[in-house]
Amino acid sequence: MGIKQLYQVISENAPDAIKAGDIKNHFGRKVAIDASMSIYSFLIAVRSEGQQLMSDTGETTSHLMGMFYRTLRMVDNGIKPLYVFDGAPPKLKSGELAKRTARKTEATEAHEEAKETGTAEDVEKFSRRTVRVTREHNAECKKLLKLMGIPYIDAPTEAEAQCAVLARAGKVYAAASEDMDTLCFEAPILLRHLTFSEQRKEPIQEIHLSRALEGLDMDRAKFIDLCILLGCDYLEPIPKVGPNTALKLIRDHGSLEKVVEYIQNDPKKKYVIPEDWPYQDARELFLHPDVRDANDPECDFKWEAPDIEGLVEFLVKDKGFNEDRVRNGAARLQKNLKTAQQSRLEGFFKPVARSDEEKATLKRKHDEKLQEQKKRKKEEAKAKKEAKARPRGAG
């Protein structure tokens, strides 16, 4: 799930933090990828009739199809992927996971009912909600990656947190995940949509944490508190607190402690904090997650030549893939992993820090843009109000 509407908050308040571009812009870069999030996206990329891709024996193969071809696409574009798998979830997350399981059970029942009485759209909608990544999915994807010569590591707990550690240490250029909470774990750069299919034609979003903090005018502590208030995987959200309210509360009060105090002392009782809301524990999980140091031997990784015959045995003979396509893909892997060894020119130069004048200019432009947006929204609201007040039939 990640952080609710964080992308919206950053895009509206720190637009310079987000850069959208083509996959080939990342040629020569090493990227740590949240494997579980990727596998989940492969599994929900179902056919219109709501069915998973299956082998002749009835085994699901959507995850393997996605992992093989999306990884191939990255390597074709000169990217060197490293997959990071989730370990055991933190205890605080168990409540959220239990809710997700309950929702999936409800969705399974609704899916069966929709197949009997509902529309095709209902069937597909509920089918997507029943999807979950299993140990078998993970094990098969690890086997596939090994045969492809693509490295992977296991995180002690959250994969996004481990990706962030590797990115901060410079072992990879960025962390790649659809979960915005990767920024809470202090990933300097987050890439989104990297493992999407080419058909979706979604540009790769590159989000820079330092620019987001600069645009929001926050330090990391305030940013984490904002993210918890927006709604994260560890806690229930506070009802009626949307992105604009969350941002205002943090800006007005400075910390979650002060926000909680304000809400509890508010005579109007506009907001109600859930009974069990251990925000300090959630904050601690973001500030000090259970991760391995980037120099730990278990964080060593390297790209190797693919095992072509092993891939044919696994994907073609065991899973029913097309042999010509698998052999063609393996040949591309072999060729393009060598090409990706070429260094990017930017690796030879250190980025120049922005001067105070440049920062001030950026902030001024950003503030002007915000004022313009607010003015436009007011004008639109006024026009709507006037249109409603106008008698029907009046020109």
Swiss-Prot record:
Membrane-crossing segments per the record: none
Short name of any one Pfam family annotated for the protein: XPG_N
Annotated spans, Interaction with PCNA: 341-349
Enzyme type, top EC level: hydrolase
Single GO BP term: base-excision repair
Bound cofactor: record note: Binds 2 magnesium ions per subunit. They probably participate in the reaction catalyzed by the enzyme. May bind an additional third magnesium ion after substrate binding.
Record PTM text: Phosphorylated. Phosphorylation upon DNA damage induces relocalization to the nuclear plasma.
SMART domains: HhH2, XPGI, XPGN
Cysteines engaged in disulfide bonds, as pairs: none
Cofactors demanded by this protein: Mg(2+)
Residue numbers spanned by region Disordered: 96-121, 348-395
Matches recorded under InterPro entries: 5-3_exonuclease_C_sf (IPR036279), Flap_endonuc (IPR023426), HhH2 (IPR008918), PIN-like_dom_sf (IPR029060), XPG-I_dom (IPR006086), XPG/Rad2 (IPR006084), XPG_CS (IPR019974), XPG_DNA_repair_N (IPR006085)
Domain of life: Eukaryota
Region (N-domain): 1-104
Function description: Structure-specific nuclease with 5'-flap endonuclease and 5'-3' exonuclease activities involved in DNA replication and repair. During DNA replication, cleaves the 5'-overhanging flap structure that is generated by displacement synthesis when DNA polymerase encounters the 5'-end of a downstream Okazaki fragment. It enters the flap from the 5'-end and then tracks to cleave the flap base, leaving a nick for ligation. Also involved in the long patch base excision repair (LP-BER) pathway, by cleaving within the apurinic/apyrimidinic (AP) site-terminated flap.
Subunit structure: Interacts with PCNA. Three molecules of fen1 bind to one PCNA trimer with each molecule binding to one PCNA monomer. PCNA stimulates the nuclease activity without altering cleavage specificity.
Protein name (database record): Flap endonuclease 1
Species per Swiss-Prot/TrEMBL record: Aspergillus terreus (strain NIH 2624 / FGSC A1156)
